[in-house]
Curated annotation (Swiss-Prot):
Protein name: Cyanate hydratase
EC number: 4.2.1.104
InterPro entries in the cross-refs: Cyanase (IPR008076), Cyanate_lyase_C (IPR003712), Cyanate_lyase_C_sf (IPR036581), Lambda_DNA-bd_dom_sf (IPR010982)
Gene3D superfamilies: Cyanate lyase, C-terminal domain, lambda repressor-like DNA-binding domains
Enzymatic class: lyase
NCBIfam families xref list: cynS
Length: 163
């Protein structure tokens, strides 16, 4: 399906991304596929799929096979580029300058301690895992026709150990 709103990559704006990012985004743009469509082809959540494209999530052998088929990329090339371990957290400068990413950063700046306090009251002393974790993005439209972004973060609660 052809879309007007397809996320693409300007590699000059992202010098820390792995080579696989350029390979994947070029094929995605050529086929005019959304992350939602690709995620359906490979059997992953659309945010997890996008994280593979940005080098922030590890692709399984099954992911590599399915991405190769969905995007018409030679399997051997993807296997070479995606078989290592991600170098997570290096792709975004801090503080972020990209407006949408900055808004997410700003949410944590403004509400981080409030989240922490409420989570500690509900669960005790600990942290929410970003490893045993899932996330999703949904679109809601209210009665007035306004669009709302709904981002769900689901992380396993990890209590701090006493030692």
């Amino acid at each position: 399906m052809s879309h007007l709103n397809i996320a693409t990559l300007d590699a000059s704006q992202h010098p820390y991304l792995p080579a696989s990012s350029q390979t994947l985004f070029a094929a995605k743009a050529k086929k005019k596929l959304s992350f939602e469509e690709i995620s359906q082809e490979i059997g992953r959540n659309e945010v997890a799929t996008a994280a593979i494209f940005y080098g922030q999530a590890k692709a399984s052998p099954e992911d590599i096979t399915n991405l190769s088929k969905a995007l018409d990329i030679p399997y051997e090339l993807l296997e070479e580029q995606l078989s290592g371990f991600p170098d997570r957290g290096r792709s975004v400068e801090m503080p972020p300058r990209e407006p949408l990413i900055y808004r997410l950063f700003e949410i944590v700046q403004n509400y981080g301690y409030a989240y922490k306090a409420v989570l500690n009251e509900k669960f005790g002393d600990g942290i929410m895992s970003a490893i045993s974790f899932s996330t999703k993005v949904e679109k809601e439209t209210d009665a007035d026709g306004n669009n709302w972004a709904v981002i769900t973060l689901r992380g396993k609660w990890l209590p701090f150990s006493r030692y």
